[in-house]
Amino acid sequence: MDIRDESLGRVFGEFQPEVVNHHAAQHSVAISTRDPMYDASVNVTGLLNVLESSLKAGVRKVVFASSGATFGNPDHLPITDDTPQRPTSPYGITKMVAEHYLRYYQTERGLDFTALRYGNVFGPRQDPNGEAGVIAIFAASFLRREGVRIDWDGEQTRDYVYAIDVARANVCALERGSGGCYVIGTGIKTSVNAIYRALVEISGFEAPVTHAPRRPGDARDAQFDSAQARRDLEWLASTALTDGLQATYEYFKTLAIAG
């Protein structure tokens, strides 16, 4: 279902959810730079439809998937919940705007929320055919014995957080973190080149590399200090990057064998 569709309200009315976990979004930075109007339509107008439908259905709380992209290129690392938000892409802008709407709906309309500002989430079942999710894209390419593309110089860093850890953060937010916006990461920054080298070691295949320019909207570095999430949500990332990479690679390997 398109979250912008007016029929969303009828669904909420039928099922009467107590809590809404809102992950539906236009999530590609690249698409947001090519079509900012579409990005805003889904991520802002769609959110407002979800919030209005929630109010009418008597929803108690919304747990919202925000993004570390709201911070852009910070002056200092690691990024904390109090780091100034200066997004470098329309995607990051719409996620920041969404947080402001959530605050409004809490203070003026009585709808509670918790927003989770994710690092780079990865893991099994991630789409390897899109423009986002370098680990899934690399893993699938390695298994097909194809080359990979590395944008920029490959030394740009991200805080890669495993999907199971992120799922736990969402469960924690069901009853905790009222009105809070929390960065969700491991506290470790890893370059794209390092991800490539780790997958070479896991797969035993050195994929040919093609270099490309920086993509519009991409930030240079990201590293998140989730101390506030530890205190308020009682959450901590527990999966080592190497373990998550291995599990993700094995998942795509199983798909390749089954296919």
Go through the PLM ranges and name each one.
Residues P36, P128-N129:
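Active-site loop immediately N-terminal to the catalytic Tyr-X3-Lys motif
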Residues R86, P128, D159-Y162:
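Residues at the N-terminus of a long alpha-helix
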Residues M1-V121:
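N-terminal Rossmann-like NAD(P)+-binding domain of SDR-like oxidoreductases, especially those catalyzing
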Residues A140-G259:
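C-terminal substrate-binding subdomain of Rossmann-fold SDR/epimerase-dehydratase oxidoreductases
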Residues V97, Y101, Y105, F138, ...:
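Hydrophobic alpha-helix immediately C-terminal to the catalytic Tyr-X-X-X-Lys motif of short-chain
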Residues I31-S32, N73-D75, R125, Y160, ...:
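Short glycine-/acidic-enriched loop or helix-start segments at secondary-structure transitions
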